[in-house]
Amino acid sequence: MFKREYKFNFKSFLIWTVITLGIFLLVYLMYPSIVASDNVKMIDEMMKVFPPEMLKAFNMDIASMNSAYGWLKSEGFVFVLLIIGCYAGILGSNILLKEENDKTIEYLNSLPIKRTTIVLNKVLVGLINITLLVLLLGIFNYIGLTISGDFDIKQFILLSITPLFPALVLFFTCLFISTFTHKTKKTLGISLGIVLISYILQTLSTIAEPVEFLKYFSAFTLADIRHVIVDVSINPLMVIITILLSISLFLLTIFNYNKKELV
């Protein structure tokens, strides 16, 4: 069953990977010409116009835009978090539900396979695909940055790991939500909404101090990129919270799926 599931999801994984790497390839091809011209000075001057809170939200107050690595630490990781977050959310909402949507659940029910086993195999495929996307993007960025110029390797490796934390929570959240419906069309919009709202909450909590508490309702807070940039270390608390939330949502998914009336 694992091979069947992995083969079924490989095409979408490949498409997401190619598109993601293509976006960053364009950046690495274009950025040398940008930093070699007067555009850098214009960008630096433009940065002075923005309020400190806005710069802080995108880490532009602690990362210079005069290099590809500086861009990656600021605007670049916005793309990284959103792309991987959207992929994880969509995968979580579809991977378990597609059997009902495609009317193949009857075939699985005819096999001597427990529902818990079905969930375990699908979750394993999801975790492998998400981890591979994070890993491949990290390797690609490493090659791109090596060609572009000097950068802090340890800091980069830690930064490359951080998108995995919100992605796992988003995956398990959308997986759990999918156990309440029978159609993938319903969960697709919900999963994308969760990802975007989660990112907006995290951004607002950084920009405005009165709503700083909103970060506790966002999965992207778990990435804690600013902490990695400043201290060159991953906050252990974020790792613990990610594990606890993922396990809790996983167990709830199994419980709900075993009770669900499959159609």
Model-found features: residue ranges?
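Secretory targeting signals
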Residues: G70, L120-T179
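A structural motif at transmembrane helix-loop-helix junctions in multipass membrane proteins
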Residues: L164-L196, L204
